[in-house]
Amino acid sequence: MSNWQQAAAEITNALPHRIHEVVMVDQSPLARTPRSTPILYLGLYDRVRELFAGRPEALSQGLTASAFSFNSGSGRCERCSGTGFEKIEMQFLSDLYVRCAECEGKRFQPHVLKIKLHGKSIHDLLELTVHEAIEFFAEIGELKTLSEPLDILDEVGLGYLRLGQPLNTLSGGESQRLKLVRHLSETGNRS
């Protein structure tokens, strides 16, 4: 039995009526790629894409939820492949990342960016902080499916993260808290 397993067993044995589970969460990075984001990691992006694809303007253009994916699909910027930046390899130095000249860092093609969900494009939505997104989703009637899971992020002090922020930019502590939030939202346990 490892030290952390022994410590967890001691804690749950000492307070069995108050502690139901102990979870080990390390500080290892969540992703090494800029393609993963908090909204993707928490499994909330599919619902967001469905909301955009359900807009009358999207339906009239034949846009499906895949058009609102920056990882694949027909709606992402072709030049930067939906990352919003281009990588310049610097032989003996660290790679340099510059904003994509075609999409100007917005990740999507112009026809996709024209689709609005209560006044916000998909890019605008991904730029929202967690705190701002909680309010936005509650206002549009997505309290249960989107606001509540994000509320846990806010409770652990990550309300300042942007929904579309690459996970490889997070610190070890931020990664650790995001892992904890994912566990709590999957188990439905917030206490």
Where do the language-model regions lie?
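Conserved phosphate-binding elements of NTP-dependent enzyme cores
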Residues: 1-191
